[in-house]
Amino acid sequence: MTICFTDGMEDFLDKVYANTSDDTRDLYAKWSTSYDQEVGGNGYATPARAAKALASHVTNLNRPVLDYGCGTGLSGIALRAVGFSTLHGIDVSKEMVAIAEEKKAYQTLRVFDPEVDPPVKIGEFDTIAAIGVIGIGAAPLPVFDKIIALLTPGGLFA
């Protein structure tokens, strides 16, 4: 396993499971240039698996999808591969978003602060993907309420 920090696995995990939004942003800013290579090299299959599962529950793959915590765009690539055509991504890391822009998978990409309301309208999306996002240090559980509020009534969150 390649680690983006030279100070060992324990310190790396402490950074991944950071306590503040600033800590999380700092981690992903540093990790952005090696993230795809590192997670790909470790067999990270979550984006492809989640995209396939999500597509099996959506009747219109042309409707807009919000990729909440889009990172470098790995999930956007996976969502496109299963047929989703209209993707919008938001993430806390401007460095990760810059890499996602290079992949050309999204109609729009925005950087946001998870401690304030996301830069999209409430009820704007039928489908929201937060692939590999919810967890301590990434998007803590209180973020759920903010994400769910963005869905149309009866919308799908994965």
Feature-to-residue mapping (PLM):
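Class I SAM-dependent methyltransferase SAM/SAH-binding core
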Residues: 66-118
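Short conserved AdoMet
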Residues: 59, 101, 138, 152
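Glycine-rich helix-loop-beta junction characteristic of Rossmann-like nucleotide cofactor-binding loops
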Residues: 53-60
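Conserved acidic residues
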Residues: 63, 107, 126
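A short SAM/SAH-binding and catalytic strip from SAM-dependent methyltransferases
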Residues: 126-140
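N-terminal, positively charged/glycine-rich alpha-helical extensions of SAM-dependent methyltransferases
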Residues: 1-33
